[in-house]
């Protein structure tokens, strides 16, 4: 047990550069890749059948244009973002603009549906 505690203490004292070098050395020694482990860990959250490794997990919702119902879109933007009336109006009039960044697919699809229902054109990136 004391040996494990010493290992924990040693690892805790590493700098970021030293930790990165350690990761590279362990990858080479064990024949694994840390990047593959991340992709495998993300795949179960994607649901369904075998998802491609490059499937995105974070999306940016971009308001492409307000369409014909600008007032409805401004109301939805306020509800989604919590912005004030002037800020939401400026965002809608300045389209294309990112509305939400770094959201998961489910949240991005929900926001997109809300905005499209209000008459906006929306892109997911």
From Swiss-Prot:
The keyword Metal-binding does not apply. It comes from the Bacteria. The keyword Ribosomal protein applies. Gene3D superfamilies: 3.30.1390.10, Single helix bin. Keywords: Acetylation, Methylation, Ribonucleoprotein, Ribosomal protein. GO terms for biological process: translation. InterPro entries: Ribosomal_bL12, Ribosomal_bL12_C, Ribosomal_bL12_C/ClpS-like, Ribosomal_bL12_oligo, Ribosomal_bL12_oligo_N_sf. GO terms for cellular component: cytosolic large ribosomal subunit. Disulfide bonds: none annotated. GO terms for molecular function: mRNA binding; structural constituent of ribosome. Two isoforms seem to exist. One is probably dimethylated on Lys-69 and monomethylated on Lys-86 while the other is probably acetylated or trimethylated on both Lys-86 and Lys-89. Belongs to the bacterial ribosomal protein bL12 family. HAMAP family: Ribosomal_bL12. Homodimer. Part of the ribosomal stalk of the 50S ribosomal subunit. Forms a multimeric L10(L12)X complex, where L10 forms an elongated spine to which 2 to 4 L12 dimers bind in a sequential fashion. Binds GTP-bound translation factors. Forms part of the ribosomal stalk which helps the ribosome interact with GTP-bound translation factors. Is thus essential for accurate translation. This is Large ribosomal subunit protein bL12. The gene is rplL.
């Amino acid at each position: 047990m004391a040996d494990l505690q010493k290992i924990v203490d040693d690892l805790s004292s590493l700098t970021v550069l030293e930790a990165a070098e350690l990761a590279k050395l362990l990858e080479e020694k064990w024949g694994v890749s840390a990047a593959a482990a991340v992709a495998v860990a993300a795949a179960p959250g994607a649901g369904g059948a075998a998802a491609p490794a490059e499937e995105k997990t974070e999306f940016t919702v971009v308001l492409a244009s307000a369409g014909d119902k600008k007032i409805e879109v401004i109301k939805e933007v306020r509800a989604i973002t919590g912005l004030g009336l002037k800020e939401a109006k400026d965002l809608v009039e300045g389209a294309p603009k990112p509305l939400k960044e770094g959201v998961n697919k489910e949240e991005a699809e929900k926001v997109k549906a809300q905005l499209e229902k209000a008459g906006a054109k929306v892109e997911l990136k």
